Amino acid sequence: MPDTSFHYVTVRSLHEAPLAIAARLRVPQDGLAHHPAVILLHGSSGPSLREGGYADVLNAAGMVTLEMDQWSARGLGGGAEGRPKTVVETLADLYGARAFLAAHPAVDAARIGVAGFSFGGVATMLAATRRHNAGFLKNGHFRAFMPVYPATWTWNRIPNFEFGDLVDAPMLLITGENDQYDNDPETSRKLVSGLSLDDRVKITLKVMPNSHHGFDMPGADMVVNDPFGNQGKGGLVIMRYNPEMSQQAHKLAAEFFKANLVDEVMRT
């Protein structure tokens, strides 16, 4: 495993009045000039050990990672009452992070992916649509997407959560069997099966058994009250760490991004 250097940086969002977003950049010290990179988007509660766990395995596979603190830049404390009102308004953060990485000398601008968790997973899915991507990039898009438990019940049911007409890039969608935002392990399968064939073939779905929301967040063992829980009925949602499933998700992430950001380039 190569050593990794840590850098604390500031990312400028692409809002009309840009936000200055604190972020942690990790760069593998493996002697290579340019690396693929993955942006890791936190959930409603803000930055956590979860993102660092994924960064560890991606760095070990030779990828740069960038973890932002999107809430502090807005003076928000996190949670259902302390997050932005809409996910759409945070897309300027994500594309600002992409611009930051594309300009970084250690990064190959053509090989940038994104993984997001919960709220961040929703942003990841939005960025995969041609509609939202075109609002920031006239040419190009992220090379790979990995949304993790992004409340799949919301898609194509509420305004601004339209999912379809996807950019030409692979997606690994990870959900939890016991996630109480969806309240049905078939929800994610129904979403994917309802897409056009062109979009369906871009998506690999993994439903993690015995897994609640936040199954990959070390130390999570709590109940939260969220109006988006229980398919929009609101109420209590269990968040519980499952170390075995977390380890499996890390392995899936490393394999997915390596295949699509590292190995794919080697084959071309």
Where are these regions (language model features)?
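Short alpha-helix in the alpha/beta-hydrolase fold that links the catalytic acid
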Residues: P159-N160, N183-G194
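Primarily recognizes the serine-hydrolase "nucleophile elbow" in alpha/beta-hydrolase
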Residues: E89-L166
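N-terminal cap/lid segment of alpha/beta-hydrolase-fold proteins
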Residues: M1-A33
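Cap/lid segment of the alpha/beta-hydrolase catalytic domain
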Residues: S45, L49-G52, V57, Q70-E89, ...
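C-terminal catalytic histidine-bearing segment of alpha/beta-hydrolase fold enzymes
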Residues: K202-T268
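Short substrate-entry loop that stabilizes the transition state in hydrolases
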Residues: G31-H35, L40-G77, T154-W155, Q180-P185
